[in-house]
């Protein structure tokens, strides 16, 4: 029984090696296997941002944080709307603040309290 099992395992290994040979030969067109390169990180300087900023066309206001084109600065969207809430200030500016687990509108209420010096 063990001799039969050993012979069967040798046959399986041999067939597997044959298929790997043919797969490599025909699927790659006889070329050597090319390794996939990992995508490169963006550089640590601001050149990538500056290049995109310089190429952006906007007839209105180009938001510096998102490179969105809007009519006026306080229309700029938050860069991460899932995590940030936009709050428009009385002077026409807007800020994006972390939602931080607060319910909707709570972050804006805290900004208003801080502006009044209450927190």
From Swiss-Prot:
Keyword list, A-Z: Signal
Stretch forming the signal peptide: 1-17
Entry annotated with the keyword Signal: yes
InterPro entries: LCL2 (IPR034543)
Domain of life of the source: Eukaryota
Cited CDD domains: LCL2-like
Protein purpose: Probable component of the endoplasmic reticulum-associated degradation (ERAD) pathway.
Protein family (similarity comment): Belongs to the LCL2 family.
Protein name: Long chronological lifespan protein 2
Organism: Sclerotinia sclerotiorum (strain ATCC 18683 / 1980 / Ss-1)
